[in-house]
Amino acid sequence: MRLRNGTVATALAFITSFLTLSWYTTWQNGKEKLIAYQREFLALKERLRIAEHRISQRSSELNTIVQQFKRVGAETNGSKDALNKFSDNTLKLLKELTSKKSLQVPSIYYHLPHLLKNEGSLRPAVQIGNGRTGVSIVMGIPTVKREVKSYLIETLHSLIDNLYPEEKLDCVIVVFIGETDTDYVHGVVANLEKEFSKEISSGLVEVISPPESYYPDLTNLKETFGDSKERVRWRTKQNLDYCFLMMYAQEKGIYYIQLEDDIIVKQNYFNTIKNFALQLSSEEWMILEFSQLGFIGKMFQAPDLTLIVEFIFMFYKEKPIDWLLDHILWVKVCNPEKDAKHCDRQKANLRIRFRPSLFQHVGLHSSLSGKIQKLTDKDYMKPLLLKIHVNPPAEVSTSLKVYQGHTLEKTYMGEDFFWAITPIAGDYILFKFDKPVNVESYLFHSGNQEHPGDILLNTTVEVLPFKSEGLEISKETKDKRLEDGYFRIGKFENGVAEGMVDPSLNPISAFRLSVIQNSAVWAILNEIHIKKATK
């Protein structure tokens, strides 16, 4: 009898374990599918946004055509000889369109009038590849003649060899040869076709070069910022090269990332870039930076390229590209009545840096004649000691003593981890928002892989509602109210504080981390995520 009972118990235990394992496997598979669906949804959302932008663009182009017909009508004064090629329906439509009085919008030709002399000025003189479109990421690589050594082949091998087969179908690499010497251009094309014939035929790699008529006269440029005449010419032409490449790439994908012809990349770079962008799909960013050097690894959303190109065309002779990009951000978000720190905080929400860097500069000999540049990205080989999130613009402060420049400001902006000497009771870390924010959740993570023991202990999380009176809150929430108006909503456990914010407390003016007991260890804060509530 005992044996029989034991057998039954064993059988029941086996069945229970089997069912539990089956349930867990089903749940895990379901979770993975959900994550995949979420990524597909975010990608679809981006494509829809780009489609809306392109419809608006086509509307603008149609308006330009109408303006041209108006000029034709005015010049011919309704001459039958000029219009007899059109059908009656077309003539009727033209009459309706041109009869409406409207203002004329300045175009690219206002800043580059020389383009009107040749109708092919904005058409690539050389175009190799099958014209792939509909990809996630377009990589743009401008290249010009170098006196000493070309790094282009090595750069392309690094980019291509670090792509998985499925990733090669979801991107396109556009090589822009910024030269008008046809013999040189054809020589570069021949080398690329020989080295990357498979990649070109598959659509992964495309090669273009501009017509000579695209460039204006660059011989009489004004020397500025102490640059020599040759350097001013070099940087001015470089701005024009970037613009041509961006215009060509704009309609090919969701994102455009600017690269150079003398770099190497990290493994898994494509997936890292794509996932980082999708994580930020609900944020209003303009530039994602995957390298700290110059214009390397700067990624934009395709619709934003229109604004960027227009801005560069307006000032292409005045300043280098990286300065112009910073001016765009300043114009968009900086308040002249506020100080520089406020401006930097606002720009940090549009210009988001990913660490560690995914691209390393390896070129020693610059494309500028005679220039040697020993530039390397110091973040390229660094381990990731902090996790980056986009947080609401805020003024940050702390009573803690900072260690070796690891400031709270840098942590909040995703540039470094915060490191402070032993906290004591009464110390605080304060995040005061520039304007009240509806917050959904929060996450504060202390310690890192190099110093896992430097964590926040006996520390609480507190929020200050924008409205001090008239809050419709539960008794449980009301009991958490402190004398200074803050509400205690959480605390650190094993170095981590994480939780949801009671919606009745929104909008929030500030977050505060308060140390309630002396600590025996130093403190590192390597992750800050104050997640805004979705509308």
Swiss-Prot record:
Q: What InterPro entries is this protein classified in?
A: Glyco_transf_54, MGAT4_A/B/C_C
Catalytic activity reads: N(4)-{beta-D-GlcNAc-(1->2)-alpha-D-Man-(1->3)-[beta-D-GlcNAc-(1->2)-alpha-D-Man-(1->6)]-beta-D-Man-(1->4)-beta-D-GlcNAc-(1->4)-beta-D-GlcNAc}-L-asparaginyl-[protein] + UDP-N-acetyl-alpha-D-glucosamine = N(4)-{beta-D-GlcNAc-(1->2)-[beta-D-GlcNAc-(1->4)]-alpha-D-Man-(1->3)-[beta-D-GlcNAc-(1->2)-alpha-D-Man-(1->6)]-beta-D-Man-(1->4)-beta-D-GlcNAc-(1->4)-beta-D-GlcNAc}-L-asparaginyl-[protein] + UDP + H(+); an N(4)-{beta-D-GlcNAc-(1->2)-alpha-D-Man-(1->3)-[alpha-D-Man-(1->6)]-beta-D-Man-(1->4)-beta-D-GlcNAc-(1->4)-beta-D-GlcNAc}-L-asparaginyl-[protein] + UDP-N-acetyl-alpha-D-glucosamine = an N(4)-{beta-D-GlcNAc-(1->2)-[beta-D-GlcNAc-(1->4)]-alpha-D-Man-(1->3)-[alpha-D-Man-(1->6)]-beta-D-Man-(1->4)-beta-D-GlcNAc-(1->4)-beta-D-GlcNAc}-L-asparaginyl-[protein] + UDP + H(+); an N(4)-{beta-D-GlcNAc-(1->2)-alpha-D-Man-(1->3)-[beta-D-GlcNAc-(1->2)-[beta-D-GlcNAc-(1->6)]-alpha-D-Man-(1->6)]-beta-D-Man-(1->4)-beta-D-GlcNAc-(1->4)-beta-D-GlcNAc}-L-asparaginyl-[protein] + UDP-N-acetyl-alpha-D-glucosamine = an N(4)-{beta-D-GlcNAc-(1->2)-[beta-D-GlcNAc-(1->4)]-alpha-D-Man-(1->3)-[beta-D-GlcNAc-(1->2)-[beta-D-GlcNAc-(1->6)]-alpha-D-Man-(1->6)]-beta-D-Man-(1->4)-beta-D-GlcNAc-(1->4)-beta-D-GlcNAc}-L-asparaginyl-[protein] + UDP + H(+); an N(4)-{beta-D-GlcNAc-(1->2)-alpha-D-Man-(1->3)-[beta-D-GlcNAc-(1->2)-alpha-D-Man-(1->6)]-beta-D-Man-(1->4)-beta-D-GlcNAc-(1->4)-[alpha-L-Fuc-(1->6)]-beta-D-GlcNAc}-L-asparaginyl-[protein] + UDP-N-acetyl-alpha-D-glucosamine = N(4)-{beta-D-GlcNAc-(1->2)-[beta-D-GlcNAc-(1->4)]-alpha-D-Man-(1->3)-[beta-D-GlcNAc-(1->2)-alpha-D-Man-(1->6)]-beta-D-Man-(1->4)-beta-D-GlcNAc-(1->4)-[alpha-L-Fuc-(1->6)]-beta-D-GlcNAc}-asparaginyl-[protein] + UDP + H(+)
Listed A to Z, the keywords are: Coiled coil, Glycoprotein, Glycosyltransferase, Golgi apparatus, Membrane, Metal-binding, Phosphoprotein, Secreted, Signal-anchor, Transferase, Transmembrane, Transmembrane helix
* Protein's pathway: Protein modification; protein glycosylation
Cofactor list:
a divalent metal cation
Q: Which GO terms describe its biological process?
A: glyoxylate metabolic process; N-glycan processing; protein N-linked glycosylation
- Cellular localisation: Golgi apparatus membrane
**Activation/inhibition comment:** Inhibited by UDP.
Where are residues bearing Phosphoserine located in the sequence? 474
Q: Which residues form a coiled coil?
A: 28-63
Q: Which residues are glycosylated?
A: 77, 458
Which Enzyme Commission numbers does its entry carry? 2.4.1.145
Note the topology in the membrane.
Single-pass type II membrane protein
Q: Name one GO molecular function term.
A: alpha-1,3-mannosylglycoprotein 4-beta-N-acetylglucosaminyltransferase activity
Topological domain ranges for the Cytoplasmic compartment: 1-4
Q: How is it modified after translation?
A: N-glycosylated.
Q: What class of enzyme is it?
A: transferase
Lumenal topological domain ranges are: 28-535
| Transmembrane feature ranges | 5-27
Provide the Gene Ontology terms for cellular component: endoplasmic reticulum; endoplasmic reticulum-Golgi intermediate compartment; extracellular region; Golgi membrane; Golgi stack; peroxisome
Query: Per the record's keyword annotation, is Phosphoprotein included, yes or no?
Result: yes
PANTHER family, alphabetized:
ALPHA-1,3-MANNOSYL-GLYCOPROTEIN 4-BETA-N-ACETYLGLUCOSAMINYLTRANSFERASE A, N-ACETYLGLUCOSAMINYLTRANSFERASE VI
User: Hey, which family's this protein in?
Assistant: Belongs to the glycosyltransferase 54 family.
Q: What function is annotated for this protein?
A: Glycosyltransferase that catalyze the transfer of GlcNAc from UDP-GlcNAc to the GlcNAcbeta1-2Manalpha1-3 arm of the core structure of N-linked glycans through a beta1-4 linkage and participates in the production of tri- and tetra-antennary N-linked sugar chains. Involved in glucose transport by mediating SLC2A2/GLUT2 glycosylation, thereby controlling cell-surface expression of SLC2A2 in pancreatic beta cells.
What name goes with this protein?
Answer: Alpha-1,3-mannosyl-glycoprotein 4-beta-N-acetylglucosaminyltransferase A
Question: In the UniProt record, what gene is named as encoding this protein?
Answer: MGAT4A
